Amino acid sequence: MCSTRKTSVMDEKVIENEEIHFQENSNGFSADLTIHQDKLKQISKTGLNLEKEHIFNMPSSLTKAFKTAFKRKNEIFYCVSTKEMSVDIKDVSGQVYLPLITKQEIQQKLMKIDPSVRSKISMIHLGAVKILLTAQFRQGIDTSVKMALIDDRIVNRKDSLLGAARGNLAYGKFMFTVYPKFALSLQSKNLDKTLSFIHQFERKDLMKTGDKVFTVTYLIGYALTNSHHSIEYRKNSNIEIEEVFKDIGQIEESPFCDISPIDENWTMDIARNKKSIATGSSSRRNFRIDESLLENKDENLLRSMSTKIDTLGKKLSLIYDNE
């Protein structure tokens, strides 16, 4: 008589406005944490305001109605995702990239949100990406590695750089953190290319094809919102390296451009009969949710696996300023 053991574990749990979800199989481990802003301090919306009464001369009753009509609640879902995967030696030459955030992952998140709120969510705010490389060979081998996180939607290679690092796996590990600090529409055609991780391992002769040379583990902090103006970022730097890794590696920030001087040419095309940019809610409806992405719930499995992700919530305080 023999018994079989499942090689894949998947579970999810919703507690009020908090949701955790994980998956583990022979290819690696992934976990997600989503928290609605009602579970955190309310983030005030500032910086974009027009006082209607300063534009229109309105009776007091109409002023009140106008303000009521234009009240808008910030819908914010803070998310932390972590994934781990082994990399084959054949994929370390810098010719492939790893997408760190995908539309499929976002679809999975949106399926857990109440439909009345989900229909409003239109933006993703990218807060932080922490990347850890762990060697799958003994310590003491000189193994230089180059890494870059790029926004591959941007055509110019220099402009696409979010952060780069050079390190060595002689001590077994290397880690750095990039802070993108920008938002984009969920309708962006190439959203999957926004956070593209590229790596180049110098010792391509260390192993043969089929052997796994190192493990990539990454942690992403982001927020799903209904507005581009919902989030303020805490970090001032664009990239950081842990103090312990500074002796064996270095980092490079994305360069800030020299602003071109304003010229005297104000010529632009203001002719009539231009095409209108489409507005309205129809664009959001185009973001189709795949119902097949819903998974079965099993609270017993959650209890046995929750220890692997119980610290993810604490990561939020390192990414967003909730003061």
UniProtKB/Swiss-Prot annotation:
Keywords: Coiled coil, Host cell junction, Transport, Viral movement protein. It comes from the Viruses. One of its GO terms (cellular component) is host cell plasmodesma. Residues 292-322 form a coiled coil. Signal peptide: none annotated. Pfam families: MP. Transports viral genome to neighboring plant cells directly through plasmosdesmata, without any budding. The movement protein allows efficient cell to cell propagation, by bypassing the host cell wall barrier. Acts by forming tubules structures that increase the size exclusion limit (SEL) of plasmodesmata, thereby allowing viral ribonucleocapsids to spread directly to neighboring cells. Belongs to the caulimoviridae movement protein family. Homotrimer, through the coiled-coil domain. Interacts with VAP. This is Movement protein. It comes from Figwort mosaic virus (strain DxS) (FMV).
